[in-house]
Amino acid sequence: MIARVNNVTITTILIILNFIILVHGASKVPCYFIFGDSLLDNGNNNNLNTEAKANYPPYGIDFPNGPTGRFTNGRNMADILGHFLFLIFRLIYFDSWELLGFDDYIPPFASAIGREILQGVNYASGSAGIRNETGSHLGNRIFLDLQLQNHHNTILRMVDLVGNRVATNAHLNTCLYIVGIGSNDYINNYLVPKRYSTNSLYTPSQYATLLVQQYAQQLKVQH
């Protein structure tokens, strides 16, 4: 986990790589799950009643499909990791660089259907935070606890597709997980005292500790 905490920001990125199975001609990581906020959202907020949307120009002006709900002109960080992240494998006689090799972009939970969920799902939501109330003044959002619940629902759907829980767990244990969340807990919570009470209840240090503790518990649920 990479974490940065100071008086005004907390940015957390988690990459969990449990195991990689090399299969000739196939994706080196069979599935990829994404949790977070607007830095990773790829369309989950499109149909929500919220000001935190990006499904209109100039967002997406450099993306092949135009505006999709990504809060960027083109690909976001999750897209770049999925397509270009390289993994080093120590072979017997030489080092080899292997591309993750996902054939397409991971779908947002809001529109993921059928067997495509076996390749992964993006649960990220603009304005979402570690704390459930974060970003509420902007409208609806899928906070981290709800993203984790959505992942649980995805797993149940995967069990139906795969046939049993044991095989599903074996599949999940080879997947890549990324979480990028926490900045909204400051810019859309702690630093908005007219809307939220956290600024008056906690010192900056206390609030940072509170976020880290809650985040740690959420990661245990995810894993």
Describe the predicted segments one by one.
Residues I2-H223:
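Conserved active-site regions of diverse hydrolases
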